[in-house]
Amino acid sequence: MFRYMLAACMALMPFLPSGAQATEVSEFTLDNGLHAVVIEDHRAPVVVHMLWYRVGAADEPPGRSGIAHFLEHLMFKATETLESGEFSDTVEANGGSDNAFTSWDYTGYYQRVASDRLGLMMQMEADRMRNLLLTDEDITTERSVILEERAQRTDSSAGALFNEQMRASLYLAHPYRIPIGGWRHEIESLGREDVFSFYHDYYSPDNAILIVAGDVTPEEVRALAEEHYGPLEPSGVEPRERPHDPPQIADRRVYYEDPRVSDPYVVRSYIAPERDPGNQRTAAALTLLSNVLAGSGATAVLPRVLQVEEARSLYAAASYSGTNLDDTVFSVFNVPVPGVSLEEAEADLDRVIAQFLEDGIDPEQFARIQFQWEAEMIYAQDDVGDWARMYGVGLTSGLTVQDIQDWPDVIASITPEEVMEAARMIFTETTSVTGYLTAPGL
């Protein structure tokens, strides 16, 4: 199996950037505090322009959940120089595409265009950073849009509602407990003054990270950034201060019934450490732990035992994402076959994890997982948008450019012993929430 993975990885190599293209990453900071990162890739005359703000759903004022996502939508309205909707129309007219996104730690905006259109993208992005105009009609219309978006993505999904309740139970005080899109009753009360206050507090060059990836040079990017972003005044935004959870001393349980559920499942989530600047080994060990437990199909611990050997599970998995500003989540899941209760499915998870903690990691499986992870990292480098996104997420989560560049080497250096140490640290019920999602009568 290992040699086939090696052959597959080698087959990818002709399609990868050359070493110079893949590793030419530079950074600079303008006098107004704008941090810029340039990723050179000269294979095609295309550029990805991203502007990331160090503000997200976890930075919203109490009682105003959803405002970060709301503002993301409103940023496509009129400015002092553009009509409502003209931003995206201009990108499209120049043969490009654009979008935006919100998470707990960041809000981001991006455009993919021909490299000779980069200056125009900066001009428009700098304009809406400080010159957004909003009418009461804009607020009313877009609030209806995001409420409908919540209805479609969350309220109509039993799994999404269940996940909201799980996070709200897992985090006791930290704002990661609040949905990215906000609670419906708080979205309904958001007004124009709320939005403008948030906009003026956080949308400024000293709270932004510019990522440009593609057919550009650092000198070109700096000249354009100085021209378009340089004149903007900084706001003096303070470093983020968030409430943190007290010590967690008891496990919690969530039981949610919904008639729309067809496949009941049990999930247990644990508070877990994130990647820290200069200290990523624990997060790397947890990344590999999630892969050992569930990341390599039928050979991973949970699916191998529960799905293949015992046929007691339709699906068993683990998940972990360490790129957060604050403590993150490690989860294990089990969707039992019909006839196996959720109580039994939970016991199955506990049993398999306990056996794993006793037996340790199979060395051959661990070598395969590390190699597969490295191959996936190499493959991801083939798209400049993925590169830009990786740096944007990392930097807005508190990492440095060096941390992001070091990550593959950190992963490659992790030992099985470190993974087992991370497993023993994480699998303590005092920091966990166990949830059952089921339907009435099941």
Model feature map: region roles:
Residues 78-81, 112-143, 296, 322-380:
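M16/insulysin-pitrilysin zinc metalloprotease superfamily fold
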Residues 78, 121, 153-204, 225, ...:
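Scaffold signal of the M16-like zinc-metallopeptidase fold and its non-catalytic homologs
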Residues 172, 180, 205, 209-276, ...:
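An aromatic/glycine/proline-enriched structural segment found at the starts
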Residues 267-271, 294-336:
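A structural supersecondary motif
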Residues 25, 49-112, 177-180, 296-312, ...:
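M16/MPP (pitrilysin/insulinase) zinc-metallopeptidase core fold and M16-derived inactive scaffolds
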Residues 5-17:
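Bacterial N-terminal signal peptides
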Residues 22-52:
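Mature N-terminal segment immediately following signal peptide/propeptide cleavage
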